[in-house]
Amino acid sequence: MSNQRIRIRLKAFDHRLIDQSTAEIVETAKRTGAQVRGPIPLPTRFERFTVLTSPHVNKDARDQYEIRTHKRLIDIVEPTDKTVDALMRLDLAAGVDVQISLG
């Protein structure tokens, strides 16, 4: 797989899960002899929701909630066949969304 690059984007709501998954991917790639660039932390997305607590009146009574989406980017430069095989077998946490692209 010469002149290839694997770009892995991770998304999660919990920053501890995404950091743990990132560490597993980086350690697996380095163990199989590939060069790793990253992990690069991408901007965290904040989604805020405001909900009226009262069903009828009292517009001043509100609750606010937010969801934070943490993102990381990992580039694996010059991956070997062992690297691809090891990454395919890797079992990551359930709360982490993984997008893989070859470039």
Swiss-Prot record:
The record, for InterPro entries, names:
Ribosomal_uS10, Ribosomal_uS10_CS, Ribosomal_uS10_dom, Ribosomal_uS10_dom_sf
Keyword presence, Transferase: no
What PROSITE patterns does the entry give? RIBOSOMAL_S10
A GO MF label: structural constituent of ribosome
Extract one GO BP annotation from the record: translation
* Subunit description: Part of the 30S ribosomal subunit.
Q: Which family does it belong to?
A: Belongs to the universal ribosomal protein uS10 family.
Role, per record: Involved in the binding of tRNA to the ribosomes.
Write down the HAMAP family for this protein, in alphabetical order: Ribosomal_uS10
Give the protein name, as stated in the record: Small ribosomal subunit protein uS10
Q: Which organism is it from?
A: Pseudoalteromonas translucida (strain TAC 125)
